[in-house]
Amino acid sequence: MIHSKSISHAISALALLTSVTLLPNAMAAPAAVPAEPRLSLAQAQQIVRAAQAKAEQEGWPGVISVADSSGLPILTLRMDHAAVPAGVELAPAKARTAALFRRPSADLENAVNGARPALATARGFVLLRGGLPIKMGEQIVGAIGVSADTPDHDEAIAAAGASALK
């Protein structure tokens, strides 16, 4: 005849053995989340300086903005005598658009003007030339948006900034 006291001791011993066996797994460090490269403020400043140098060299003052990969602004610069007052709104929006769509904003302008006019209904995006993704290796880490006096100038200034980290 088995006593309830013996059963109780057996269950306690089994519970102790199970917890000791599982303890190392419970205490193991959690798996590391892979870190994505991110733009620092210093890198955003480097990008803006390169874009500003191009704008000054060519005589095309404007607004230059750098956003992170989420489209959030890191740094915006309004140069003296910026050609378009609305540039303070347009440049950050172009950077946001290029960051979130992961492509140049010119691609979206071309789509709206071509086979995808419905894209113009995408609220909160600026589908105009002058926004370019910024890459570290093959990873898009942000974008630059520029609003100067012409779309060609916007793109040239943005390209100078986007290439600053290479």
Language-model segments: residues:
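Intrinsic low-complexity, intrinsically disordered segments enriched in polar/basic residues
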Residues: 1, 7-8, 26-32
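Bacterial N-terminal signal peptides that target proteins for export
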Residues: 2-14, 21
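C-terminal segment of classical bacterial N-terminal signal peptides
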Residues: 17-27
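Flexible, solvent-exposed loop/hinge segments and secondary-structure transition points
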Residues: 28-166
